[in-house]
Amino acid sequence: MKVTLKHHEELGPLVRATRKCQGMRQDDTAEGIGVSENFLAKVERGGGTVQWQKLFQVLTELGLRVEIDVPDAAVALLQEQDRMRGAKR
């Protein structure tokens, strides 16, 4: 099921629910992923100061993917910027 997140605080409960559905304890999960239990707890609470690299490490290890619905106009702009960079080379 795809879930659209509107705020960073909404990600934490999804991480926690996924971990619990997999029957994993917080301390064991953190150790297995290579992050501190304190960090994983911050992720699960939706802490705003979470380090992105570690956050994606946690998400990947739990089998969660982040999908972003990008407006067509933004995709077109990025493609145009890529073409412009390619033309300058």
Please give the residue ranges for each predicted region.
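A short, Lys/Arg-rich alpha-helix, primarily the initiator
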Residues: 1-20
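Short alpha-helical DNA-recognition segment
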Residues: 24-41
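Short, charged recognition helix plus adjacent turn
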Residues: 67-89
